[in-house]
Amino acid sequence: KFFKSKWHIEQLHPPQYEAMEAVFSKSNILLAIPTASGKSLVAYIAILNQLLTLNPGSRAVYIVPLKALASEKFEELKEIGAEIGLNIGLGVGDATAEAKNIEDCDILICTSEKLDSLMRTKSELMSNVSVVVADEFHLLHDATRGPTLEINLTRLRTLRPDAQLIALSATVGNCEILATWLD
């Protein structure tokens, strides 16, 4: 209802529709489709499916590479959360009011660097994670950001092996190899 009434989304694009089977079966997903084709919507649906249907009371982690992207996702998810009673937290390394919501949030949007810090200092925050979204997943190959992302995902998979992992990218190469790694 929200997506139709607030964002005027009448139907899913074919790649989004094809991803729904994996979303609802709780499978890990590598969604590699072009920019502005609706990857985030698939991730949002996966998050809502986990938090509202499959694992109420659990937490979602949405990993992004940049503060600007974190702020964008925070605003979008805050709008969704306000409609359905989910609290959204933002972790980008700043001591902002949003950062104070990290411990009480249902959905945590954060940079890889902030997630790394949280897993070292407040690992209990990850104890009830049911879904992890890795946006701009192609940065796994980046010499600067890739190692932190890979370590974070590996740690999360160790801490929460049953958590659903949604990897999003418009430009990732080696899809088959990376999809195998996700599973």
Regions found by a protein language model. Give the residues of each.
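Conserved P-loop/Walker A NTP-binding site and adjacent catalytic elements of P-loop NTPases
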Residues: 6-183
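Conserved adenine-nucleotide phosphate-binding loops and their immediately adjacent elements
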Residues: 1-5
